Amino acid sequence: MRILQIVKTNRGATWAFNQAKWLMENNVEVVTVLPEDRGGYADKYMAAGMQVVKGDWSLPLRRPWKFFGRAKEIRRVVAEIKPNLIHLHFVTNVLMVRLALHSDKTPRLFQVPGPLHLESPFFNFGERIVATDSDHWAGACKKTCRIYEEKGIDPARVSLAYYGGPLAQQAQEPAPAGPILRPEYGIGQEEKMIAMVSYFYKPKRYIGQTRGLKGHEDFIDAMELVFKKHPQARAIIIGNAWDGAEAYEKSVIAYGKEKLGDRVIFTGYRNDVKDIYPEIDIAVHPSHSENLGGAAESLAYGVPTIATNIGGFPDIVVDGQTGLLTPVKDPEALAQRICYMLEHPDETREMTDRGQALVRQLLEIANTAGTIKGIYEKILKEG
């Protein structure tokens, strides 16, 4: 079985790499199209024995004159690789490939990493209108699958397929020698670390967004309220700007310092997040749109987790059972839930233990990638 995978970024999408690596190790040949064939994840794919093809297969909305040349290149590569199935992860790639291969009968699978584009009427309609009988969908959360079915897509062409990671291997890794952020930033042992781990995604003004997608400003507003009841808490924001959002990141830092003063710490990018998680008291995910997001990571590391009640979060953050859900864009409600966890440590620990067990089983790469392999086989068998 030969799969042609299309990934729009060479910088991230670790979930796509983990999945492809497992598939390669389990008798599925994976050829991956990336914007670059050197550096970044291209090197990781090749080190894992996978062929990488250089190509930007995104829909050139801002440079429409590039469309026909790009479509010609897509048809050339597909004719050369001769895949049994084309696997896509990003809507901009999906639109481009469907238009370029509209009459091509090669089966295509869109593994939808989140419901964000479905929340835009333009992309929601556009993505479905260019689909043909060759197209199939694998939603990476229950909400995504539900939206497609509600929009009239045949349920037989829609599957549930989470992205996963090597969680069993992670569980065997030695614990860090000791705290990292506490000594680095002079955080006392009595201070509770309430953390948000996320890149900064700038607001999309053209669709009316005034705050960033990940809800950084909501977290800051919530922590201002938390400090009134729990002055011993500290707000920690880990991450940096994503894809040209440097000006937005600076504005959030300024906003945070204005509202919280020295009680908020912005660490910037860290390559040791997995070693930092054990010292975090509560992980907060106030996203405005999301799949499973960072909640999967914080639960996997056994950190008490609060997330907004949107997207795929409820699949793993079962309110009151594995963590707490909070209304989206509601800093006051978020503050109440942070305070609840601080004031109920035993109950919080029990929820977190259940959440860790759920995530480590549900999102183990052998289970998630095994599901994708089964979907491939089903699509190809049905012809």
Residue ranges and their predicted role:
Residues 4, 188-214, 220-223:
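Conserved donor-binding/catalytic core segment of Leloir-type glycosyltransferases
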Residues 88-94, 112:
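Short His-centered aromatic/hydrophobic patch
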Residues 109-138, 151:
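A conserved, positively charged/aromatic
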Residues 239, 249-268:
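Nucleotide-activated donor-binding/catalytic signature segment of Leloir-type glycosyltransferases, i.e.
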Residues 278-291, 303:
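Acidic donor-binding loop of glycosyltransferase active sites
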Residues 304-307, 317:
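Short hydrophobic beta-strand element within catalytic cores of glycosyltransferases
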Residues 319-320, 324-331, 340-346:
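Conserved acidic donor-binding segment of nucleotide-sugar-dependent glycosyltransferases
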Residues 333, 340, 347-362, 368-374:
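A short, well-ordered alpha-helix in the C-terminal region of glycosyltransferases
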